[in-house]
């Protein structure tokens, strides 16, 4: 049976655009065919998880049923008359929401094969489930339509790797039909993003990831015996080649996901906004935006508020420091259970905390450090970009291969 992985090759887009034609025509005529969109999404989900991927399909089905019941039960509890909004019930609901992905992430620590609960996109579905539970807790979601929640949870264009959307924002788009003029603008943007995505993923991503990266990795492994910790100039080449591959491959995928969403009348948030910014904190706020904002809103802000409420740390500076440390440690663990993902997260926390410390120091000693381009931030491809590229070298796992294999 035909198996199609999201945005894997140009042939995939031929099937996708043909299937989307009724949706596009309907939008231009001023109506949305929810029934067709549901069938279309179901067919493409089946094509992702059929054949040898069927075990993942069964895991996805079990995950969806479990979490639909979880979210529905928590919503009913939270909105019933006289609800005490128990913190214990909330924590239990969040814990159950992340239980599947936690099992999948940590199973390789105890056995040589992955968990039977794993499937493509489990992390991104978990973000949607947990984010919805937290917004129900806050009272932001006062009306939860389970059919619309299913559409949100299984929204096909973004199911495998985001961008991460929010239930309330998604439903606003899902419930309305954009006027023809606005939809024409969405289609124009979608075409632009598709073309740019092809350039990024299938051309530049191929150059960095297929043509250059294996060559410099081979040179780095061959020269590791004559250098301290195996570090040599070819390792620098690996750092830049992998950083280029990671950016263009993932940015290309994200552009595809946003473009297809636009064609369906859903304005999924962008994942990148001029990411090679001057300051580390700005770069991280422009790189994989939806993930950064999710962690900021649902982990960092809540953890900082919790520390301040319970007066764990009196200093706001140290509160922010600990908040960033916890945030990026969790983000590192989310990527995987290996040491280099954890170090990657802690390294990013260090970069942001050092940047903030420098800006505070400069402000305190402004007579000696005037506010100008030289003191406010390094140039885009000097200190900041090199530090971030080094973090991607850590993230790649190549140092683990270089040192331990």
From Swiss-Prot:
Entry-linked InterPro entries: Ac/AlaTfrase_AlgI/DltB (IPR024194), DltB (IPR024024), MB_O-acyltransferase (IPR051085), MBOAT_fam (IPR004299)
Enzyme Commission number, as recorded: 2.3.1.-
Topological domains, Extracellular: 1-9, 50-53, 112-121, 224-232, 336-338, 400-405
Location(s), subcellular: Cell membrane
Signal peptide limits: none
UniProt keyword annotations, A-Z: Acyltransferase, Cell membrane, Membrane, Transferase, Transmembrane, Transmembrane helix
Top-level lineage group: Bacteria
Example GO BP: lipoteichoic acid biosynthetic process
Segments crossing the lipid bilayer: 10-29, 34-49, 54-80, 87-111, 122-138, 180-223, 233-264, 316-335, 339-372, 379-399
Domain comment as written in the entry: Consists of a ring of transmembrane domains, which shield a highly conserved extracellular structural funnel extending into the middle of the lipid bilayer. The conserved catalytic His residue is located at the bottom of this funnel and is connected to the intracellular DltC through a narrow tunnel.
Function: O-acyltransferase that catalyzes D-alanylation of both teichoic acid and lipoteichoic acid (LTA). D-alanylation of LTA plays an important role in modulating the properties of the cell wall in Gram-positive bacteria, influencing the net charge of the cell wall. Catalyzes D-alanylation from DltC carrier protein.
Designated name of the protein: Teichoic acid D-alanyltransferase
Species of origin: Lacticaseibacillus rhamnosus
Source organism phylogeny: Bacteria, Bacillati, Bacillota, Bacilli, Lactobacillales
GN (gene name): dltB
């Amino acid at each position: 049976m035909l198996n199609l992985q999201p945005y894997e090759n140009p042939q995939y887009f031929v099937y996708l655009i043909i299937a989307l034609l009724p949706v596009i025509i309907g939008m231009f005529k001023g109506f949305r065919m929810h029934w067709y969109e549901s069938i279309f999404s179901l067919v493409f989900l089946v094509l992702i998880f059929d054949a040898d991927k069927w075990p993942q399909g069964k895991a996805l089905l079990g995950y969806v049923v479990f979490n639909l019941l979880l979210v529905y039960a928590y919503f009913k509890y939270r909105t019933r008359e006289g609800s005490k909004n128990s913190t214990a019930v909330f924590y239990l609901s969040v814990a159950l929401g992340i239980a599947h992905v936690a099992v999948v992430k940590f199973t390789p620590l105890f056995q040589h094969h992955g968990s039977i609960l794993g499937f493509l996109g489990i992390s991104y579905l978990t973000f949607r489930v947990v984010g919805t539970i937290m917004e129900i807790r806050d009272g932001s979601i006062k009306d939860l339509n389970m059919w619309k929640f299913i559409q949100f949870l299984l929204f096909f264009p973004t199911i495998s790797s985001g961008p991460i959307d929010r239930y309330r924002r998604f439903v606003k788009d899902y419930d309305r039909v954009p006027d023809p003029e606005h939809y024409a603008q969405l289609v124009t943007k979608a075409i632009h993003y598709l073309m740019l995505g092809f350039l990024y993923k299938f051309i530049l991503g191929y150059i960095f990831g297929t043509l250059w990266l294996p060559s410099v990795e081979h040179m780095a492994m061959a020269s590791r015996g004559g250098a301290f910790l195996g570090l040599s100039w070819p390792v620098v080449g690996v750092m830049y080649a992998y950083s280029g591959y990671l950016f263009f491959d993932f940015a290309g995928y994200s552009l595809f996901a946003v473009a297809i969403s636009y064609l369906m009348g859903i304005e999924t948030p962008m994942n990148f906004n001029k990411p090679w910014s001057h300051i580390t904190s700005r770069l991280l706020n422009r790189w994989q935006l939806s993930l950064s904002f999710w962690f900021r809103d649902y982990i960092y802000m809540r953890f900082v508020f919790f520390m301040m409420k319970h007066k764990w740390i009196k200093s706001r500076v140290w509160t922010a420091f600990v908040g960033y440390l916890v945030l990026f440690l969790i983000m590192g663990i989310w990527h995987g259970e290996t040491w280099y993902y954890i170090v990657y997260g802690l390294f990013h926390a260090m970069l942001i905390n050092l940047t903030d410390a420098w800006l505070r120091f400069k402000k305190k000693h402004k007579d000696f450090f005037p506010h100008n381009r030289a003191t406010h931030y390094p140039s885009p491809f000097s200190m900041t970009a090199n530090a971030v590229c080094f973090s991607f070298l850590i993230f790649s796992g190549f140092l683990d291969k270089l040192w331990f294999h």
